[in-house]
From Swiss-Prot:
Sequence motif: Nuclear localization signal, positions: 402-413
Domain writeup: The PIP-box mediates the interaction with PCNA, while the UBZ4-type zinc finger mediates binding to 'Lys-48'- and 'Lys-63'-linked polyubiquitin.
Cross-link (Glycyl lysine isopeptide (Lys-Gly) (interchain with G-Cter in ubiquitin)): K341, K376, K414, K435
Motif mapping: PIP-box: 325-332
Organism: Homo sapiens (Human)
This protein's encoding gene: SPRTN
Role summary: DNA-dependent metalloendopeptidase that mediates the proteolytic cleavage of covalent DNA-protein cross-links (DPCs) during DNA synthesis, thereby playing a key role in maintaining genomic integrity. DPCs are highly toxic DNA lesions that interfere with essential chromatin transactions, such as replication and transcription, and which are induced by reactive agents, such as UV light or formaldehyde. Associates with the DNA replication machinery and specifically removes DPCs during DNA synthesis.
Protein name in the entry: DNA-dependent metalloprotease SPRTN
Crosslink site: Glycyl lysine isopeptide (Lys-Gly) (interchain with G-Cter in SUMO2): K303, K341, K361, K376, K423, K424, K484
Effect of R91E: Abolished ability to mediate autocleavage. Does not affect DNA-binding
Effect of R189E: Abolished ability to mediate autocleavage. Strongly reduced DNA-binding
Result of changing D473A: Abolishes binding to ubiquitin
Effect of Y179A: Abolished metalloprotease activity and ability to mediate autocleavage. Slightly impaired ability to cleave covalent DNA-protein cross-links (DPCs)
Amino acid sequence: MDDDLMLALRLQEEWNLQEAERDHAQESLSLVDASWELVDPTPDLQALFVQFNDQFFWGQLEAVEVKWSVRMTLCAGICSYEGKGGMCSIRLSEPLLKLRPRKDLVETLLHEMIHAYLFVTNNDKDREGHGPEFCKHMHRINSLTGANITVYHTFHDEVDEYRRHWWRCNGPCQHRPPYYGYVKRATNREPSAHDYWWAEHQKTCGGTYIKIKEPENYSKKGKGKAKLGKEPVLAAENKDKPNRGEAQLVIPFSGKGYVLGETSNLPSPGKLITSHAINKTQDLLNQNHSANAVRPNSKIKVKFEQNGSSKNSHLVSPAVSNSHQNVLSNYFPRVSFANQKAFRGVNGSPRISVTVGNIPKNSVSSSSQRRVSSSKISLRNSSKVTESASVMPSQDVSGSEDTFPNKRPRLEDKTVFDNFFIKKEQIKSSGNDPKYSTTTAQNSSSSSSQSKMVNCPVCQNEVLESQINEHLDWCLEGDSIKVKSEESL
C-alpha cells in the first residue's frame, strides 16, 4: 500500500508541473519581450497604434493620425495638436528609429499616445509638460506591459550622427562652455535671425558663424543638381524665344477676310473681269448691231459679279442676223435648278448678270427667271467669250420685283465651272416688231441643234443632234424587227 501511495504522489507532481508549464505558455508575451525582435522586428506602425488604442486608451484616439517623418532627426517623436475638434497628429522619426530595437519604437509610440490622450480628454494640453497626469498614465502602462516609458529618450548618438553641418563663431563665444561657439545641424541652415537665441548672441558676442564641416561631396552634389535643373529650363525658354540675329520667316495671311455689314460696291482686287474683255464684247455686239438696225434706245445692262461686289456697264443690244447664227448656236437652253450651289466654278471665275432695258438689276420677277448655260466663247475668234456670265432676264416689265440683297459669298463660290451660265430674255419695247422678236427667239433656240451633226452609234450615219433620239429609236426598232423575222424563219 505504501508503494501505491508513492506512485500516486509522483504522478500528481508530474501533472502539476505540466499544468504550470501549460499556463506559463498561454500567458501573453510582454510588449518589450526580447522574442519580439525575432518574431516581428519591423512591425506595422498603424497596426501597433490601433492595438494600443483599444488596449490602453479605451478607443479614445480614433481621430488621431500617426505617420513616419523622414526629415525629423532632432527628436524621436512629436505630437502636434490641430484644431479644437480633438484632431492631432503623431509623427515618429524614421531616421532615428529605423535602426533601433523594436522596444524603442514601442516605448516612443506609447509616449506620444499619452500626450494625444491627454489632449483629446482635455486633461492636459501642454505637450511639453510631463506632469502628474502624464506620469500616472506612464506608470500604469509600464506596470501592465513591462515597458520602460520615460519622459525623454536617450538616442543622443543617433542625433549627433545626423548633425553633419557644423558652424563655429569667430567671436568670444568660441571659448565659452558648453558649446564653445559650435552650432551643429542636420540640415544646411546657417544660423541667422530666425533662431530664438540670435539677438542675445549679437549682444554678448557679435561674432559671425563660419561653416567648418559638411558631408562629403555635398557641395558638388548641390551644384550638379542645380545644373541639371537649370539646363532644361533654359532650353525650354530659348525654344520659345527667337534669336535676335536670326531673320524671322514672315508668312502673309493667305485667307479671305470679310467685314460684317459691308455694303461697298468697289471691285475686289481678285476680279477677273477687265475692261479689255468688255471692250471686245462691245465690238462684237456693235458689229451685229450695224448689220441689223434695231431700236438704238434698247440697251442691256450687264452686271459683273464676284464675291459680292458688282460692276455695271451698258451695252447696246445686238440684233439677230444670219451672220450672227454662229454665235447664237453656242447658246442652248437649260432647265433652271433650285439649288444655286450647282452653279459654281473651279477657278473662281466671275459671273455676269444681265438685265434688259432701264429695269433695275434686282427688279426681276421670280416667276420669269430661268438659267441658260453657255459654252466657252473665244474672243479671238469673235465667237466665244472667256468670261463666265449669268444673264438675269425678265419677261414682265411691270411685274413684281424680286430683290437679291448682297450676301457674303461662300467659300465654294471660288470654284466655278469653266462654262458660263447665262440668263437672257427678250423684252417687248414700244418700237420693236413682235413678229421679228418671236422669230429671233425661235432661231436662237434651235440654231444649236440644227447646225451640229453627230454619228449614229447603230447605223453610223450622220444625223442632226436634235434628231438623234428619234433616229436611235427608229434604228433599234428596225434591228429588233429583223431579229424577230430571222428567228421566225
